[in-house]
Amino acid sequence: RSKQDIIPVIIDSFGGDIYALSSMIDAINHCSLPISTIVEGKAMGAAAILFSFGKEGYRYMGENARLMIHKISYSNGSSKIKMGDYETTTTDNVDVLNKHVFGLMSKNCGKEEDYFYSQIKAKNNADWHLNATECAEHNIANHIKLPLMKIDMAINVSFG
């Protein structure tokens, strides 16, 4: 076993897929070591939600970093969205996913379950851009600085 007592996750991302985020959330939740999340540059969309999964007290954000929170969107792979039952089902599913991930983010930041969902809704569902100070005010970031990390590495490979 490693002597490492915390796992750093460095984030500089325009965001990504909600289902990939779900996989990362499960990995973090099942990890026996605490996770420190560190935003360098930007964390947008799914990356912003991932940032909130750092252990309380271990969420770092660079002074000039930015965070952007937005509702989950969907695409059927073309510029045209098909009307009818498919769209209704997909829209309902997206709303359930939005409430779920924003509920998790709210819990991670010590807020009521609907805190971030309500914030986005109050902004007419527009993208919400925050600087590091604003992230600290909402308890998304715990520190407005990048942590000093010392890395010692050893690799042992054996073939039998």
Which residues fall in each region the model found?
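N-terminal organellar transit peptides
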Residues: 1-46, 53-160
